[in-house]
Swiss-Prot record:
Catalytic residues identified in the record: S1268, D1386
Gene name as annotated: nte1
Matches recorded under Pfam families: cNMP_binding (PF00027), NTE_Ploop (PF24179), Patatin (PF01734)
Record membrane topology: Multi-pass membrane protein
MF annotations from Gene Ontology: lysophospholipase activity
Reaction catalyzed: a 1-acyl-sn-glycero-3-phosphocholine + H2O = sn-glycerol 3-phosphocholine + a fatty acid + H(+)
Descriptive protein name: Lysophospholipase nte1
Enzyme Commission number(s): 3.1.1.5
Topology, Cytoplasmic side: 1-74, 139-1538
Functional summary from the UniProt entry: Intracellular phospholipase B that catalyzes the double deacylation of phosphatidylcholine (PC) to glycerophosphocholine (GroPCho). Plays an important role in membrane lipid homeostasis. Responsible for the rapid PC turnover in response to inositol, elevated temperatures, or when choline is present in the growth medium.
Amino acid sequence: MATDGGPLAASSASLDSSLSPLHASPSPSSTYTASSLALSAPAIAASFSVASTFSNSLIPPPPLPPPTPSTMAGWFGWVFSFFFQVIPSVLYWVITFATITLPTWLFTLFSMSLTFTMNFTTLLLIALAIVSTISWFIRYRFLNMYSRLPSEPQRKEPHLDLFPDVQEGDSKPGLANYLDEFLSAIKVFGYLERPVFHELTRTMQTRKLIAGETLMLEEEKGFCLVVDGLVQIFVKSMRDGKPNVDEGSNHMGAESSDEDDHRVDGKQGYQLLTEVKNGASMSSLFSILSLFTEDIQLRASEGSSSSASSVGPSTNARVSDSFPASPHGLEDSPRSNFVRDHGDSVAHISNSNGELLPSVPPLNLGESHAMPIQEPYPKPRSQPGKRRRKSVHPDIVARAMVDTTIAIIPASAFRRLTRVYPRATAHIVQVILTRLQRVTFATAHSYLGLNNDVLGIEKQMTKFTTQDLPNEMRGAALDRLKDKFIKERDRLGPEEIIKGIALHNPFAGRRRRSSSFLRKEAVLHAKMAAQSKRPVSMASPEDISGDRESAGPSPGDLLSTIQLSRFGPRYEHLAPKLLSPLTDKENPPFMAPVMHSSPFHRKKDAVDEDALFRESILDCIMNGIGLTSSTRDVLRKSSHTSGDISPKLLSYDSRRQKAVFTNNAFGFIDPYDSSADGETESMMSMSMTSAGGTSPIVNLREELRNDIEIVYFPQGSVLVEQGERHPGLYYVIDGFLDVGIPVSDKGEDLVGGSRPVYGQPPEEFFPTLKRTTTSSSRVSGVTSATNDTKRKRQSRKSLYLIKPGGIQGYVGSVASYRSYTDVVAKTDVYVGFLPRSSLERIAERYPIALLTLAKRLTSLLPRLLLHIDFALEWVQVSAGQVIYHQGDESDAIYLVLNGRLRSVLEGTDGKITVVGEYGQGESVGELEVMTESTRPATLHAIRDTELAKFPRSLFNSLAQEHPGITIQVSKLIAQRMRDLVELPMPEKGGEHANVGSVKTAASVVNLRTVGILPVTAGVPVVEFGHRLQNALHQIGVTNGVTSLNQAAILNHLGRHAFSKMGKLKLSQYLADLEEKYGMVLYIADTNVNSPWTQTCITQADCILLVGLAESSPSIGEYERFLLGMKTTARKELVLLHSERYCPPGLTRQWLKNRMWINGGHHHIQMGFRLTPEPSHPQAKRLGAVLKQRVQVIQAEIQKYTSRRIRQTPLYSAQTPFKGDFHRLARRLCGRSVGLVLGGGGARGIAQVGVIKALEEAGIPIDIIGGTSIGSFIGALYARDADVVPMYGRAKKFAGRMASMWRFMLDLTYPTTSYTTGHEFNRGIFKTFGDSQIEDFWLEYYCNTTNISKSRPEFHSSGYTWRYVRASMSLAGLIPPICDEGSMLLDGGYIDNLTVTHMKGLGADVIFAVDVGSIDDNTPQGYGDSLSGFWTVLNRWNPFSACPNPPTLSEIQARLAYVSSIDNLERAKNTPGCLYMRPPIDPYGTLEFGKFDEIYQVGYAYGKQYLEKLRSEGSLPLPEETEEKKKLQRTLAPRRASI
């Protein structure tokens, strides 16, 4: 084998050697035969040579097999072979491919020659295909980006959830129900301290009445309430044999239902007044007042003897039998002697059973073991010359319909309460007087039209208050006083004089004195008196009526007083006489304080007649209000007698009061006092210092002397306006005051005078003299200008005159009522003025003033008002409680005293539609009561609400005796029905018809409370609340605005304000504030779980959720708490922006998860810190301190640099009334200014000029609505609230629309429309981009016509370009736009000027700009048939006298706009609508090329129209507020420099 195959063997060896690296260890099974190798050796050799070459050129060599780890040398060999064999092979392959293989391929490719031969047609087709492909890509992939925006459908209006009514009437059985009914009945007394509550209820008794049993309430001597059962109250239809009704009344009653007319004993006819159910009182408010005031004298002229006897026995025996008492003495009566002899036992027996009372009604007060009724006691009541007063319940009978349980608090409990707790009594009387005004007087005057009965009380009150000046203050002294005003009158102009000239008061600055300091002095003096075992009131009467020389008490006075008391009675009586300027007329009242220390430094030649006038006026006022020296002397004597005769009882009371009150955490605090020092006082100290007012420390008279102002008013000046709070008391020195009412107010405002009187300056805490010129200042600021212009010229009706010596404003000032009349200076008049705050201090320290007023009111009350007061029920309902359900029987009319109600209609499909909301002073339910139909809707309370329930039985009774009441209520119903006809509600029944929304006109009118709630912690709600309050002040809210936070509440009510018992006091305090101010802001500045946050939610008519726009839109913790409260109040979202810009889509992120936002949203620009400092500072480390310091420095630098780097905002308010907070304030007040823009094609360019004219005139625009081109222009302005970007974008869009090439390129086969709509879409999309309506700075909407569902739709959310495009879609020219399966077209087909919808959103004044075309109304007479050929010839015949008949397209267009014409005429006659139509008739619908010309036409017309309104005085400018401030009362009167 070796010899034969030498060459083959050599080649095989070489092959083996070359393959050896690849196969280091060949398999032993691989065997080859010699023959096979010999036959294929050349082929194999050639193949292997090629393979080796190719592998060397393309494939890198494989890696070396790993060496055997037997020795270290193997490892080194493997690494050596890898570096020196594999790597060079790879480099060789890369270099070979780059330098040889790749160039060879390229050379071969480029050396080839290809030849294509095509004709022109082929080239043209190819070019056309390329162009078509590119145009398709640009058209459908680039230019129609608007069609690929993410789906953002309109936001659905939230549905209202009526939470289940858990406050059903008889839900609690047993004792709990009994207690609840009793507590609900005594709520009329307001907040009761624990000892006061025990004092009232410890003698309470219960009585069972069987069905059919009658009770004569005119003989009942106590407070009666129904605990369980049903009682009907009847009144006699005749009195003293004289019918009070016409002859037909009995026949009317006989024909009516059995419940309206009853006969008792077959003699007298009775009429049903009301039905009293569980938890209601059988006593009226006047009867409660009579229980407190039966021992009070009516006038100061009755003398000290009679007055002394009137109170003495009451305090002696603690039981008086004079209900309703004669104010004359009973000292010699056997009963008085009996009570003196028996002491405490008689008091307890009489208090517990009340059997010593005269004229005991035939009531069996249950089982008792008291002494039998003694007949001789009532007989001495009839003394000669003394007439017994009639009952306050004349001719009133109660009858039990079922077995009934009643509770009776006897009159003795009220008398004892008056004596032991005089300040608490005064507080209760104040509450009852307030509710008397809110319930009875307001209902009778404003609702029933009983002006004569209500105003007659004030007229008759003058006989009690008239007090003449001393003789020495008349004649020459009065002439000298008048001479002091002459120079000032000559110096000032008529406009300044009519405001009033006040005499200079040098000591006016000393009026304000810390009430807390006076309280501490009073408590200290009371403790000193208690330690010395002497009564506080041992001084002489001159000590009370006298006046110390100093301007106010001081600590030095306390020391001097104590020293005088130590010297003995002689000096004790001498000091007041020496220190009283009334006893020594030559005393200069305003000496220096150093002279006051000695009573002997007086100069007779330093007589100050001004001070004497002030003191004389003060004496007359104090006598007029019942605060006389004899009264106080009597109270002082009564307190001595009580202490001397029954010292055991006095000590028991003092111990009991002190023990109970010390343990009681809720000290008595006056609701109008901001000091919390009263919590440290005891009941005894208050009773001793306030009953007689005898503390020489708290010498109120010294303070009041400096509060008296002497003011001159020329003839015609208005001192008090109807509907406002009395600024104080006016004492007429010389001249006459005319008291009257505007004639038109009787018919204009039938519902309580609570309708806002805008433009009045806010009421200050100390409202000094405020003057007006005429009654024209009653005009509202931006309410309907036409109605207010008419009101200016209406006359007034004079009621009576106030002569010299008379007092005006007594009832209103002491009881904090609003004035029912105007008070005008009949002649030049000189008056003394005492502010209302001074009267409040008098009432606080001397409860006798309130009790005297209550006594006088009960004595002057007409019988009609008494019956109305008896039948009216004061009802308190909780938030969410349903008052009546849909379909219930209508049994009463409800008048809202405080709170807010909502009426909702429950549909068959479960949807809830808001019918209306009712605020303070409004009524609901008259139509159902008069028609005796069922309730058409469900009425529930949005928050805690006080109502006056006017039962149908009372209405029927009054209708028979007083038909004028029926006429008055009929006028009210007729006015409401007319409003429903003239201002229809927005269309219902669709997805976009605001079903369930509370965003209606009724929901923004008469808002009284607004809660400001943050979304999450860190939102600056306090600063936001203050800015909003300032804006509300500037726009002029009636009666002013106040804001409350937790600190303010704690300052007023103490730290226990939010406790279980303190909530009663808190609710009453908040109700008083809401009645006092026009709007109250509740700022939730505490943590989320605090009671104050809960109070802010429950007390709010509207809740503003304030969030930072740049922060996370997730649900905050305050919102979760709000949802847990289940409140039904209107909720609005307020987004705070650092800059006046809202990124597209931001608002949708906030609203997406907040379906409970049912009142809209607002964008507000307000500077704030995005990273507020933490409220709870953490432990400060060195690194944290440095980091915090750096952050502070960085924030300070950014404050001065970052805002300058940014571009200036697009809009800056030129007037302060165009700010965001003013816009929100007008929205809350229902005084928003709306702008409605109509459609008309290119004629709508004139609207740009009108808007510019409005902005230059300073008129703010709050809501914008538009149709067709009006929707486009309105959206441009609402987006930035500035005319500059609006003008630029509108002109750019007009340029695109003026290009005919764009429309020619957009033409298509006219199956649906002539164009595809793409160019139109592009023009609108290039203007608005992807912005959404929610992101607009101003509230905006546009309307469209849904031809799929044949209804109009209003869009206020979603992409702007889509709904603006839909609102501008003319049928036939542009295809309808599809929205959720519906086809939308131009909104002008149904309503081209959407004034009605704008009015429904709450806009008060609406500027409506109409640019539509005018239809050709030429009469046609072509006959009954018409030839088309004749029509064509007639059009071309210039001599034809026949008008051209309309074409087919014209007929279709007119047919499409039929309903729009009717809505346009209705819009022109809408109250508050200012209709504007620029002269744009010569311009066509598509003449967008004349932009500048049409713009100038609109601008010139707008300026001319607004100037015309300004000259007529009907322009609703905010600047008018400044002018009205000149006409109305100034903040402080101009003082004469005399």
